[in-house]
Amino acid sequence: MKKSLLLLLTALLTVSTLSAQGADVLRRKYSQVSYGKNNFIHGDWKMKSDFAVNFTSGRTFYLHEDEIAGLIRFGIDGTWTDFTYAKYTRPLAVDGKNNDYKFHQVDYALNVGPSVHINPIDDVFVHTYFRYAPAYSLFMGDKQIYGNYATYFVTGLSVSYNFIALGFEGRFGNCDYNNIASAKRIEQFKPNEENVIDERVKHRGWRVYVSFMF
């Protein structure tokens, strides 16, 4: 009986010690899933996405181990995976008939930028960041595929408790798309005009996310 109590006490002390140490460990890696909307702005018209989903994974490189004033840490975020898919629906009248055309956008980006991490109490953190996000963007219609390098910027804010965080971020940028595949010219973008993306496309969007930090 005494041995059992001793083992139980030892186990409780070990768990307590690990928990206390875990609170001081910097959580450097992050993975997040998000849902949002995107605006595709081409010339004088704008198309809003039905939805957009994203998966992001990366790491924070803290510039110092100890908190400044017992409250703030600064870091550099490096995101190795930033994958976004957005779906659009645009009603157009072609040959006197109304049709809903579907469009799909796929982006793969890398991110880098500064971040600020505030620890007001215990395991609660507030994170804010601004990242430069070079990407390759694909935009696909029924018969066309466009693609090119895109320049994005991402800024956001999240609140975490222990290893989980809820956040919101804005995403904006632009892309000069090139037609990289074409099966047939159809009037998807501008009725009665050749189907081309002949101006720089601006992207504006937002997303809410759940993030896991390790």
Residue locations for each model-derived region?
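Cleavable N-terminal export/targeting peptides
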Residues: M1-L26, M213
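Short glycine/proline- and aromatic-enriched beta-strand/turn motifs that initiate or cap beta-hairpins
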Residues: A20-A69, R200-F214
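Residues that define the transmembrane beta-barrel architecture of outer-membrane proteins
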Residues: R27, M47-F55, I68-G70, H104-L110, ...
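Membrane-embedded beta-strand positions of outer-membrane beta-barrel proteins
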Residues: K29-Y35, I72-I76, V112, T128-Y132, ...
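Transmembrane beta-strands of outer-membrane beta-barrel pores
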Residues: Y35-I41, I76-T84, Y132-M140, Y161-F163, ...
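Predominantly the C-terminal beta-signal and adjacent terminal strand-loop region
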Residues: F40, Y146-F214
